[in-house]
Swiss-Prot record:
It comes from Cucumis sativus. The keyword tRNA processing does not apply. The keyword Plastid applies. It is found in: Plastid, Chloroplast. GO terms for molecular function: rRNA binding; structural constituent of ribosome. GO terms for biological process: translation. This is Small ribosomal subunit protein uS8c. Keywords: Chloroplast, Plastid, Ribonucleoprotein, Ribosomal protein, RNA-binding, rRNA-binding.
Length: 134
């Protein structure tokens, strides 16, 4: 049984968001770096910094929480892993699903790297659907 790093980071972010934690630490790999850049660019996280501890690199993510009178509430409503090691899901650019009518994002792994559904549609390429965020 292998490790599924994408499921691990999605679960870490979801758990920290549900418990209203301000920060979450995830292992730094090339895949997680690309996903973190997308989350930062799309506004789901506030800040990212790289942390080195005992010869291992980690990303420390600052989650974005909005404040109201009762306290902070979460911004990321849901993260869902779609393609997994036991069942890969692929889509061409015409059949990439739209999440909440375009309000959410789909993260894809394409031949040109990891990107969002909007970027893949603009470039006219499909790929493996990694996760939904809405």
């Amino acid at each position: 049984m292998g490790k599924d790093t994408i499921a691990n980071i999605i679960t870490s972010i979801r758990n920290a968001d549900m418990n209203r934690k301000g920060m979450v630490r995830i292992p730094a790999t090339n895949i997680t770096e690309n996903i973190v850049k997308i989350l930062l660019r799309e506004g789901f996280i506030e800040n990212v910094r790289k942390h080195r501890e005992s010869n291992k690199d980690f990303w420390v993510l600052t989650l974005r929480h909005r404040r109201n009178r009762k306290g902070p509430y979460k911004t990321i409503l849901n993260l869902k892993r779609i393609s997994r090691p036991g069942l890969r899901i692929y889509s061409n650019y015409q059949k990439i699903p739209r999440i909440l009518g375009g309000m959410g994002i789909v993260i894809l792994s394409t031949s040109r790297g990891i990107m969002t559904d909007r970027e893949a549609r603009l470039q006219g390429i499909g790929g493996e659907i990694l996760c939904y965020i809405w």
